[in-house]
Amino acid sequence: MKLAIHNEVAVSNDEVRQLDRAYVFHSWSMQGNLNPLVIAGAQGCELWDYEGNTWLDFSSQLVNVNIGYQHPRVLAAMKAQLETLVTIAPATANLARGEAAKRIVDLAPAGFSKVFFTNAGADANENAIRMARLYTGRDKVLSAYRSYHGNTGSAIAATGDWRRVPNEFSRGHVHFFNPYLYRSEFNAATEEEECQRALAYLRRIIECEGPTAIAAILLESIPGTAGILVPPAGYMQGVRALADEFGIVLILDEVMAGFGRTGSWFAFEQDGVVPDLVTFAKGVNAGYVPAGGVLISEPIARYFDDHFFAGGLTYSGHPLAMAAIVATIDAMKEEKVVENAASIGNEVLRPGLEALAEKHAIIGEVRGRGLFQALELVSSREQKTPLTAADMAAIKGALTEAGLLAFVVENRIHVVPPCTITAEQVAQGLAIFDAVFARFASLAK
């Protein structure tokens, strides 16, 4: 058994796994039968364990390592900040925090002026909801069934998927169906029909819930964990129009889709819409240090000039996280990482995935933007029957064994590599998909 050296001590995968299972309590799982993958290190788009096994990362972990692992510029900025000031309370003014906020505001469309920093996407959504309620004096929040907004009180209640059910204690949350033409709730046959019917349905929800009671509509610009559900043309503009008509704050969750993932700094830019609040995390500094935030439009920022904002976090704007944000944004600009996500995603990855769909009947649909793509796997294209959990687990295991880390959710594979990935690495990943799908061809009826 090959052993890696860690802090001058030989370490094996088994030792690390045993330590984990003895003391670590994992999220979203039953603890008894867990067998976590052991990771020792990473660089760029690749990871490895303590025994020499390597993987190409097509997951970006939880869709956050947009700039790749161990980027030297980000590491250097973090080291410099460590030597200057490692922590400071959020009530102070700090250079790293101010520079990070300015860079984020500068990336946004005209009309945004302030950033409230959090530690992750969940508390970003939590505080955006709080801002909307304080700003409007209203209570209700509308959000989609096909969504995930985080695992804190209001964020998990706003979430639409199964994870909200055992945690649904927060008040004032109403859910609605967002567009998903492949499995339309509106019996639509075209994107235009899906858009029109989804907007008409949302209008009725607003009317029935009482417009003067609704503080916010919270949507992911492109629902991520729910399936990378790219909204049909005109839908987001229609939601913006409804929000304007009824005086509702529009919050767009860019936690997963933002900071280059779709080939633009913010996914909503491609839909021709500007929200009132934007929540972000993940790609803002690639998860090197936990960070998130709320990007605040000028009218809402001005409101809190003379109205008290009842919210805060001990580690809001942590200097180490802020230094990582500044370096990440600067490096992404200079190295044209966002442009790479657009070109590699739309011109290399997407055509490659579509070619796989032509070859393998278990692929029911390919969808996405940039390096935010999804494969929906089915046993019957005609019936759109999802592959079972057991089948998906087997496919995920085969991909891992072949050297590819995949992001698997229900019957889908989300193809979301770091935004620094090369065409050659995409070809390598597509070849692994091809070989594994061929092994499971019998699943398609």
Question: Residue spans of the language-model regions?
Answer:
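Conserved N-terminal phosphate-binding loop of PLP-dependent enzymes in the Aspartate aminotransferase
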Residues: M1-K445
